[in-house]
Amino acid sequence: NIKWKKLDYFEPYYFFVPKDFKANEEYEKGFKIDDVFSVSNSGAKTDRDSLFIDMDKNTLEGRALRLLSGDYDEKFKQKYRVINSGSYKLSKKLKNRIFDHNFIQPIQYRLFDYRWIYYDPNLISRPGQKVFKHIVSKENLALLTCRQQSTFDFQHVFLTKILVDICTVSMQTKETGYAFPLFLYFKDGSRATNLNMEIVAEIEKIVGKVSPEDIFDYIYAVLHSPNYRN
């Protein structure tokens, strides 16, 4: 007695529920966000937020000093989980590491929630250096969004000038936050745009000469547009 319904599908979408693809042709005329920006990465993940992140800079500094000096007791070890778990071998990472004040950096932990992180890429689980080496102590902007959505209507867009956590945009497990920096920095201190210049050229054919900031602002505005979101 089951009434079957044949589903329409095409690459790269293979939904197992009915979908309305009427607007898909118009939607596909746009550019994919990870095609517009050449370099991107998920936000930083420490695996030990209570150890490496704090609201107070001085408190974090004291805790990091204690951790890296090895001058801590069993209570400290249990409270801050100074233990190995899964593939994250903290004890191994701590070997031969010394405290460096330059690793204390501001982080946008959640939306409008700014904290401090001891950002030693050799210590935390997933530092996201691919992106954050272009942001930490640099003049830059990064677009924040999620690659997939598992909850309510699309509103997963923000921006940052500093480090972000993997859950800055959303705390849902499936909604990992990604950062797309506007500029890439080189060892000599120079920088270049992180935008795909072929796509920039296509845009300039329509609107004329634009700056990287113009395109960044436009993308951010469109992603906030009610018409686009609907």
Model-identified regions with their sequence ranges:
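Sequence-level detector for compositionally biased, low-complexity segments
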Residues: 1-230
